[in-house]
């Protein structure tokens, strides 16, 4: 392992992965000053266009199917249609061409007689191991992981380091009897130790479930109680905004309520405070990570991974829980792996030299998505701190220092960069970046322009959208198409996406807004929900609305000239004005540009016995500003002129704060329920749950 300096050059080497100091050279403190602001001119983006003689995995895959079927696909859209019409062949050939290692072969890809709502199983008879597939492909001496800190130190771990650490933890888990059918939990930050724990868990055939360290005990228990874990990985301290935060009280409260726990493993690698078992209740169950690790000399080599059936559990993921106890979704070993291979290798064209830096916590599905990137034989960059305070530049500093080639984060963070107008690429070397990911909420057109001006001109902007429900994406980016600002470039291969109008009819050759629907099975559907023996929760979540099709809950507009998709917000938060549906993102795109408005959220409130909706707009003002009549008039005028009279709200109110989930999504449905007079539980996944109190006074 090596630590690298601010210019990306190696400065010191440590076999144990530790760094001797936190100093860096040639970096700024991230504060905005007059010189930076003066550099900002009108945005002049350089948008991505496919180069001549483009060579990608997707084009190779397209050529494979052309030769196999004696067809010629005119473009990506024709190829996409083929992969949906022939989804069994597509996923089978992708599994073979991407070299997925199976211990036992399959006897059936899928039963094509079963519809998507019947949840057919994939690759029946096949056995494999997720960890083996993901971490055994890379060259031993190549860098697998770069662990970055708020102090701007970066510690590197090779594939050999990673494998040996996984073997040591996996051997210890086996010694505690952990294997298929068991669940291991992590109350953890996004660090190297966590990554090792995830891979070690999957290496022995057990399922992994995690919660972010910014969750309170109640939020963690809402999730972990459902899975009955035997082992818990956690940390004694975390840092946030450069402040050291003791986790002892949280851990004690969590462990007290989880009687199935047999072992609690505490990491102290990335803090200055060492593990002390006497601080914990039930201290006999606790050990440090170093104590828990089997010495490498005692690990039986070559290490033997536990093969499990394709549809065995890999990850237990949770719904946001914004309107109740989070639903526990079980994602399969093979389905997750194959979907992530398609997204990283085919859609993303990830290669061995790539470095992926996606800013995420371990409570967001993007973490699970990110770690599968190692299947490409490249590197992942890990960072778990505040991205804006005290240093608004920290993400880009780390991207530059690690020479990341692919970066990603929630769309709200790009919104903040746009507001600050920081010309990052004039301050740091971001020249290696060729792909920029955004997700969590719709990415504004202005953010496209900002990214392709001040972060990575000419880079592919992959605005991706899917969800925890599929542990992946329905739509996103592809290198064989040009960028259209404001749109997700394309429908992903093998994902048979349609848009249905308010009469539940498919929208064909029209740019009409509609509900995003998937009509054929795909591998990364949850196998089941926990505590759902009759399957009712599963059916209600996806099929009750448009059975037999999967209704995902997104309101979209498919651009039939480009093939791109504009995400308009959640369909359950979509506004209904006289029978015309309006996506909330359209209102935000106008209102958030108006001076003196910091943020906003909109909700529909049913009136006239549910036949129509009254639209309420709530705005958060910039500190020191008030919602005046002139600002209200400006909102009305801009919405009427830029959108339509139907976009004009019935009422506009000022509130102190806007509620967000921990992954950066506005909590629209909860606000809608509150103003409609319904009781709403304050979910632990809401970053600022007290903000919901502001809306109670506006209920019916």
Curated annotation (Swiss-Prot):
Principal subcellular localisation of the protein: cytoplasm
Task: Report which reactions are catalysed by this protein.
Answer: acetoacetate + ATP + CoA = acetoacetyl-CoA + AMP + diphosphate
**In what ranges is there compositional bias, type Low complexity?**
18-35
- Nucleus among keywords: yes
Q: What is its EC number?
A: 6.2.1.16
Q: Where is this region: Disordered?
A: 1-35
The record ties this protein, via Pfam families, to: ACAS_N, AMP-binding, AMP-binding_C
Query: Upper taxonomic classification of the species?
Result: Eukaryota, Metazoa, Ecdysozoa, Nematoda, Chromadorea
UniProt lists the family membership as follows:
Belongs to the ATP-dependent AMP-binding enzyme family.
Give the record's GO biological process terms. Answer: fatty acid metabolic process
Q: What does this protein do?
A: Activates acetoacetate to acetoacetyl-CoA. Negatively regulates let-60 Ras activity during vulval induction.
The UniProt entry, under InterPro entries, shows: Acac_CoA_synth, ACAS_N, AMP-bd_C, AMP-bd_C_sf, AMP-binding_CS, AMP-dep_synth/lig_dom, ANL_N_sf
Reported tissue expression: Present in most cells of the organism.
- Gene name per UniProt: sur-5
Q: Where in the cell is it found?
A: Cytoplasm; Nucleus
Q: Which GO terms describe its molecular function?
A: acetoacetate-CoA ligase activity; ATP binding
One GO CC term of this entry? cytoplasm
Please provide the record's keywords in A-Z order.
Answer: ATP-binding, Cytoplasm, Fatty acid metabolism, Ligase, Lipid metabolism, Nucleotide-binding, Nucleus
**Protein name (database record):** Acetoacetyl-CoA synthetase
Annotated source species: Caenorhabditis elegans
């Amino acid at each position: 392992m090596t630590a690298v300096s601010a210019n990306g050059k190696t400065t010191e080497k440590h076999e144990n992965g530790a760094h001797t100091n936190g100093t860096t050279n040639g970096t700024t403190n991230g504060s905005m000053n007059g010189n930076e602001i003066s550099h900002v001119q009108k945005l002049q983006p350089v948008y991505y266009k496919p180069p001549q003689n483009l060579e990608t995995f997707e084009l190779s895959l397209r050529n494979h199917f052309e030769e196999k079927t004696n067809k010629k696909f005119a473009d990506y859209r024709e190829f996409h249609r083929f992969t949906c019409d022939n989804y069994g062949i597509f996923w089978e050939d992708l599994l073979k061409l991407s070299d997925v290692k199976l211990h036992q072969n399959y006897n059936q890809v899928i039963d094509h007689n079963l519809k998507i709502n019947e949840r057919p199983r994939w690759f029946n008879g096949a056995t494999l191991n997720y960890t083996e597939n993901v971490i055994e492909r890379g060259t031993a001496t190549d860098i697998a992981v770069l662990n970055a800190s708020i102090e701007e130190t970066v510690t590197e771990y090779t594939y050999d380091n990673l494998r040996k650490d996984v073997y040591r933890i996996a051997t210890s888990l086996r010694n505690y009897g952990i294997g298929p059918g068991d669940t291991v939990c992590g109350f953890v930050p996004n660090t190297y130790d966590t990554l090792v724990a995830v891979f070690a868990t999957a290496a022995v055939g057990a399922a992994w479930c995690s919660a972010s360290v910014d969750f309170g005990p109640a939020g963690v228990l809402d999730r972990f109680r459902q899975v009955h874990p035997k082992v818990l990985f956690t940390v004694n301290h975390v840092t946030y905004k450069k402040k050291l935060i003791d986790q002892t009280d949280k851990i004690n409260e969590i462990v007290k309520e989880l009687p199935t726990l047999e072992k609690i493993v505490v990491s102290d690698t990335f803090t200055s405070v060492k593990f002390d078992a006497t601080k914990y209740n039930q201290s006999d169950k606790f050990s440090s990570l170093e104590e828990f690790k089997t010495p490498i000399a005692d690990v039986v080599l070559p290490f033997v991974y536990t093969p499990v059936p394709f549809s065995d559990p890999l990850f237990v993921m949770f719904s946001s829980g914004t309107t109740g106890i989070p639903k526990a979704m079980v994602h399969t070993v093979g389905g997750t792996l194959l979907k992530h291979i398609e997204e990283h290798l085919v859609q993303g064209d990830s290669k061995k030299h790539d470095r992926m830096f996606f800013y995420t916590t371990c409570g967001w599905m993007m973490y699970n998505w990110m770690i599968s990137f190692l299947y490409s034989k490249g590197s992942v960059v890990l960072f778990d701190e505040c991205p804006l305070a005290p240093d608004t530049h920290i993400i880009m500093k780390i991207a530059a220092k690690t020479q990341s080639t692919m970066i990603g984060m929630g769309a709200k963070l790009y919104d903040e960069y746009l507001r600050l107008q920081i010309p990052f690429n004039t301050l740091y070397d971001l020249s290696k970046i060729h792909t920029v990911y955004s997700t969590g909420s719709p990415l504004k057109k202005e953010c496209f322009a900002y990214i392709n001006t001040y972060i990575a001109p000419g880079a592919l902007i992959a605005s991706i959208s899917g969800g925890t429900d599929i542990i992946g994406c329905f739509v996103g980016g592809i290198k064989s198409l040009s960028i259209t600002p404001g749109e997700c470039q394309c429908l992903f291969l093998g994902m048979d996406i349609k848009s249905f109008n308010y009469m539940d009819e498919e929208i064909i050759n029209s740019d009409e807004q509609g509900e995003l629907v998937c009509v054929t099975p795909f591998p990364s559907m949850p196998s089941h929900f926990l505590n759902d023996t009759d399957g009712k929760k599963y059916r209600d979540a996806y099929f009750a609305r448009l059975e037999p099709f999967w209704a995902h809950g997104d309101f979209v507009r498919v651009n039939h000239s480009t093939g791109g998709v504009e995400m308009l917000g959640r369909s359950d938060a979509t506004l209904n004005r006289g029978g015309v549906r309006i996506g909330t993102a359209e209102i935000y795109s106008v209102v958030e540009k108006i001076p003196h408005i910091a943020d906003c959220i909109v909700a529909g409130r049913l009136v006239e016995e549910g036949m129509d909706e009254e639209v309420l707009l709530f705005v958060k003002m910039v500190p020191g500003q008030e919602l005046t009549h002139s600002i209200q008039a400006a909102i009305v005028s801009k919405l009427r002129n830029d959108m339509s009279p139907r976009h004009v709200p019935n009422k506009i109110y000022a509130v102190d704060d806007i509620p967000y989930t921990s992954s950066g999504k506005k909590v629209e449905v909860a606000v809608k329920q509150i103003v409609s007079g319904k009781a709403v539980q304050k979910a632990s996944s809401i970053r600022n749950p007290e903000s919901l109190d502001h809306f109670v006074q506006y209920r019916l």
